[in-house]
């Protein structure tokens, strides 16, 4: 089975082949999966259930072959894997900024503005605790805030990995940023329901794009 990995703003996403990957592995919503890229041609996959207990590791038995892929994407062939679980969670973090040339800190200029001292809400603390077991000790998180100058006018936003999904980002009179015109369809398509907790990551590449973590 072959998938393509795309790097956007310091995070990796499966841009092609994800539906087939889910079908072949039997992944289910609400459970967790960890991808560990050891070399450009080798990938390990670890599985966790809802209680974060480790399942059987999905470790490939041979080297993976790199396939030709579009710019900023990597094609990786993955062997057949046993039934496992899935969490559609996009992790945005960075390694030590002094040693990692691919870290998110290298892309901070592409973000409208950022703050290392933003207040961390209980929901974000819980989110970090859930995925903390997957991260290296040097990993750092950045909470992105919107620059007032950037938000003087409404902005068109594209969903990462899809040029056809666009929404309108609007700043209300009480300084809240809202996604309008296209959000309802996007939420319904991606099973985002009332009371869902979402973390939004905005960046420019060169247009404003977004990834959404649903907790």
Curated annotation (Swiss-Prot):
GO function terms (MF aspect): DNA binding
Ranges of compositional bias, category Basic and acidic residues: 95-107
Cellular compartments annotated: Nucleus
DNA-binding region ranges: 1-51, 123-215
SUPFAM superfamilies named in the record: DNA-binding pseudobarrel domain (SSF101936)
Gene3D superfamilies: DNA-binding pseudobarrel domain (2.40.330.10)
Tree of life domain: Eukaryota
Chain ranges passing through the membrane: none
Keywords: DNA-binding, Nucleus, Repeat, Transcription, Transcription regulation
Record's compositionally biased regions (Polar residues): 108-117
Region (Disordered): 92-117
Cellular compartments per GO CC: nucleus
Name by which UniProt lists this protein: Putative B3 domain-containing protein Os11g0625400
Species this protein is from: Oryza sativa subsp. japonica (Rice)
